């Protein structure tokens, strides 16, 4: 791939033609929605999403749930106003379960997020500012040179462990597990019993993980899964899954 890129760069006409094609191809390669739709072929797939936000902005699962009318999903979001948006965006279909909770070790803990009034006072905030929910206040404070600090709010939340949540909600199998929790991803993923639940795809955010936790997550999964970097995420594809050894994904493989 690198050799091809170098050859194209040396020929201006080829470069002008190839650049948009390459960008389109790379964009598809980095899009988890594309790969989930390619690999998960079950008509009645079960999705578990931890950190659902509003179920729309920047959500790789939303379009799949709308396209596949028999897919079911457990959607978990701790921030109250985002949870209400989440319910509104998906409606009252029986195939969706909504849980307003945070996944941790089961203890009561203070959870922090950005008040929605921040956008009124700082209009140029990016659309994803309200995705900054965390058990770590400093994680939010560190964003945008600290301008969000006056708008950080908190609430004591009764946490729940992932196994307890799955048992309580009657989840017996998982086809797709998506975790997006601002640096808490490994702590949640590590609670998954891979002997009981063996998802076809696990998608989680690595960008905010300490290097030790990122490496631990890879070690945890690599026996059963092929691991790929998709931008800020790692996508784990079960080795037994359809098209698990996709050649077009090879260059994105995790090497740790």
Predicted segments with their positions:
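Phosphate/nucleotide-binding beta-alpha loop and adjacent structural elements of enzyme active sites
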Residues: 1-256
